[in-house]
Amino acid sequence: MIIEPRMRGFICTTSHPEGCAQNVKNQIDYIKSKGAIDGAKKVLVIGASTGFGLSSRITSAFGSNASTIGVFFEKPPAEGKPASPGWYNSAAFEKEAHKAGLYAKSINGDAFSDEIKKQTMDLIKADLGQVDLVIYSLASPVRMHPKTGVLHRSVLKPIGEKFSNKTVDFHTGKVSEVSIEPCSDEDIENTIAVMGGEDWAMWIDALKQADLLAPEVKTVAYSYIGPSVTEAVYRKGTIGRAKDNLEATAFEISDTLKSLNGQAFVSVNKALVTQASSAIPVIPLYISLLYKTMKEEGTHEGTIEQMQRLFAEKLYNGSEIPVDEKGLIRIDDL
């Protein structure tokens, strides 16, 4: 079967298994080239199939020889249709991990649901006993709330007033003006429900109650702050409110983990074109200009370079984890 790229809006709807496998291999090779990290040995990655989640899983496995369980929601291949990229990424990761003699299993389903939480906990209990690191890296536009049954949809809108700026179409290279109408209060609530910290806290509570968290466990979620040019639509918009909620949740989770001497952190990562970020107007144009400057300065890093630094220099550096005045780990410091 010959796979041609097919586009829908900003998303390429077809993926190439060999390209995905090569991407995974390149990341593994990078981690191996950087040497061992004295990190966690039993790791759960929620949102493990693309972007920062996939790179976190690769860093744990090939940097620290960790056993990993990955949770994600991806489409397998069907008649005449390739699988989603995350499906191929995860298949390639498992193949490479098993080849290296590492434990790696995955659960494909809705991480927001009670059912997938239970399946994951059963697997941890049966195979690993406990985990000493939980990475939370979900990027989803919708969330069915497991307790209320309400379907929440996140939106990317400014708060209070209309936002206008330039953006770029990646397919044509054309720069155009884009305007986004302000959100309603309901939009803010829905976006917090999908992208805030509630589900992260639910995972940690469930794992703790089932005695599946090891002493001194760490849990990390990912965030982005960005520049003033994207502030109105990003950090001071609906998504920013969700990120504020996520960051506040880290402190609540740290309180929950006190009895285990555990800690929760939010890591602020650098701007990247990922499936998640390319959906945001203005961001593609900002990032394309930013990349040029960072590459000239030698400071550009993909997801794997950032995660290698997070694990080696921040989380598992042999002493205290460096944070800023708000308690955030800053990977966007370079």
What are the residue ranges of the model-derived segments?
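The beta1-alpha1 cofactor-binding region of Rossmann-like NAD(H)/NADP(H)-dependent oxidoreductases
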Residues: N108-T120
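NAD(P)H-dependent oxidoreductase Rossmann-fold/reductase module
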Residues: M1-K25, H98-K99, V229-L334
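Gly/Ser/Thr-rich loops at beta-strand to alpha-helix junctions
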Residues: G47-L54, F112-D114, A139-R143, I225-V229
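Rossmann-fold scaffold of SDR-type NAD(P)-dependent oxidoreductases
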Residues: I46, V131-A139, L151, K218-S223
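Catalytic loop of short-chain dehydrogenase/reductase
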Residues: R153-N261, V268-Y291
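Canonical Rossmann dinucleotide-binding motif of NAD(H)/NADP(H)-dependent dehydrogenases/reductases
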Residues: G35-F73, P77
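A glycine-rich helix->loop->beta "capping" turn
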Residues: Q119-T148
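Glycine-rich phosphate-binding loop and adjoining beta1-alpha1-beta2 segment
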Residues: N65-A104, D110
